[in-house]
Amino acid sequence: MTFSGNRALTVVAVAVAAVVLAACGKKEAPVADVQVIKIGHVGPVSGAIAHLGKDNENGARMAIEELNAAGLKIGDKAVKFELLAEDDAADPKQGTAAAQKLVDAKVNGVIGHLNSGTTIPASQIYNDAGIPQISPSATNPKYTRQGYAGVFRMVADDVHLGGTLGKYAVETLKAKTVAVIDDRTAYGQGVADEFEKGVTAAGGKVVGREFTNDK
């Protein structure tokens, strides 16, 4: 799932709010009084979907620059936000390694990961370290149903997205029979499965399920 620059600004703002809990004022302060807040970002900046990860990271960097230019303060201290970026290559093993690296760097919060497959295993590492994590695009319902208080998402999960679309197809578009095509990716299949459930629950009938890919 793609993630625009504007949404990146929103995610960073929400992440900062979750980390610092308060921010106000724009007065200059001596360097000694500046508090550095480290924000981690993890996404695939190598591999097949590197373009999405790079877009996300660039958006986060822009947001950090805007926040620093605003001269925010927490209490009586000026704050400076610092972005620490890691590549997970959309691979769960590399994702957990990146997560541990950010924990070791003592980040205050993390934006990431992009894929549910990397976000979910990494979330345990952040949770155990007491570091809040917000994913801009992980849609697997399991992510926010693990009982971790510090995990957040910026998008609807597969159940809400696919299920609502299925209900809409039957109740609003008046579709009685529906055929479903998905691309067999974890994301595509997850949404399609929930779409089927939504159609059936609304009284419609799924008459076929086909698959495709990017070839």
Task: Tell where the protein language model's regions lie, with residue ranges.
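Beta-alpha junction/loop-to-helix N-cap segments that form part of ligand/metal-binding clefts
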Residues: 26-31, 51-55, 73-145, 212-215
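Signal peptide-proximal N-terminal region
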Residues: 58-82, 200-205
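Extracytoplasmic "Venus flytrap"
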Residues: 37-61, 86-92, 114-117, 181-189
